[in-house]
Amino acid sequence: MKLLHVAPSQGTVWVRKGFQVFGRQPLGFASLFAAGLFMSLLLGIIPVLGSIATLALAPAVSLVFMIASRRVATGQAAMPGAIVELFGAGRSRLVALLKLGLVYVAATFLLFWLAGVLDGGALASFFAGLRDSKLTPESAATRVAEPGVQLGLLLRLLFLGVLSIAFWQAPALVFWGDPGWAKSLFFSTVALWRNKGAFTIYSLVWLALFMVLLAIVSIGAGLFGPERFALVAAPLMLVFMTVFYASLWFTFADCFSSSDPVAASRGDDVDHPDPMKGTS
C-alpha cells in the first residue's frame, strides 16, 4: 500500500460521503450498529472482563464499519456481508486484529493510570463520590468544577485523542494491507500526521455537527419535555454515531492506494461506484 497526501478540504468530503453511504442502506448500517450495541450490553454483564473485552473489540468495530461502507459504496449489501467478510479474512489478519485490541486495552489502562497520577486521583475520587446517597446535584456540580477533576478529564481526553491517532487506520491496514499490528500502528500515525489538515477539518466538522445536535436536543427537551423528546433524541444520537463510523472508510481509502481492485474501491461516486476509482 502507498501512503497518499490529500488536501485539507477532503475532510468535509469524508463527512459528506459518510452521510451518502448511510443514506443508501440506513437499515443495514442501523442493524450493524444495533448488533455492536447488543454485544457490548451482553459483555457488560460480565464484571471487569466484560469491560476489557468491549475495549479490546473497539478496533474490530471500526473495521467492520469500514468494510460495510466499502461494500455499500461498491453496490453490495452492508449486512450480513460485512461480518462474513471480516471473519473470512484469514487467521493471520484476525490474530493481528486481536493483538491490536489487546494493545489498545493495555495502552488505555496505562494512559488512564498516568492521568490518575497526574491529577492526584481527583477524578477517581469524584466518581467514587457519585455513589454517595447523600450527594446532591449542587455538590456534584461544585466538585466537577474543581481544578483536579477538570485536569483529570482534560488529560484523559487528550490521551485518548493521541491514542486514536495510532489506531485510526491500523485495523484497516491489518485487514487490507497485512503489514502486521506493530507496523500498522506506525503507518496509521504517519498517515494522520501527513494528512493532518484534512483530519483537522474532518474533526472540526464532526464537532460542529455534534454541537448542532446538542442544541436541537436541548431546544426540543425545553419545548416538549425531556421524557417526551428522549424518544426523538435517542435515535438522532444513534444515527449520528452510525454515520460517523460509516465515514471512517473514506478517511482510509483516500490516504492509501492499493493494487488490489477490491481494496482500492473507495466509492468516489456513491451512487455509481467504480472499484478502480480514487476519491478526490
Tell where the protein language model's regions lie, with residue ranges.
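Hydrophobic alpha-helical membrane segments
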Residues: 1-280
